[in-house]
Amino acid sequence: MALSGNVLTAAQAIMKDEQAHVLLLQAALGSRAISKPAINLAALKVGFNSQNEFLTLSRAFEDVGVSAYGGAAPLIHDSKILGTAARILATEAEHTGVIRELIAQSTGLTVTALDNQDILPLGSSNGRLVSADDNGLTPIRTPSQVLNIVYGGDRFRGGFFPDGVNGAFNAVTSLA
């Protein structure tokens, strides 16, 4: 699959930011950083056959990422790490906006909800340009809710992370 035009430009910019985020988080966490878990891209079953699939997958990653940072913020007690996470969250929100705009501009592209909190982009049923509810707030997800999505509904492992993830939050404990 070859990306082109604004999708390629966005993908390259987002890739650069994501690589920088990994380095920033590793530096902020220091010895508390966890090792990279195994990743199974094939489990996603979308994202690599067309530009529209790439946008669908990118939207899922970015929207879940934004909601994950929002949900994790109350759990971060180190002000330096919280400050870094807040700045990354702002960038991730911009990524989400770019991807959602590209989806809105795509002909015939609709996406399905990831869970009951998902706010779909324009072009989808009840879609919105930005991922915000009637109060102008983006959804937040607890670590368990994020893991439920990336594990494909499993409690301990599966989906995108076939062997689970490392760290204190590694299992789905509650979806409330």
What are these regions (language model features)?
Residues 1-176:
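All-alpha RGS (Regulator of G-protein Signaling) helical domain and cognate RGS-like helical scaffolds
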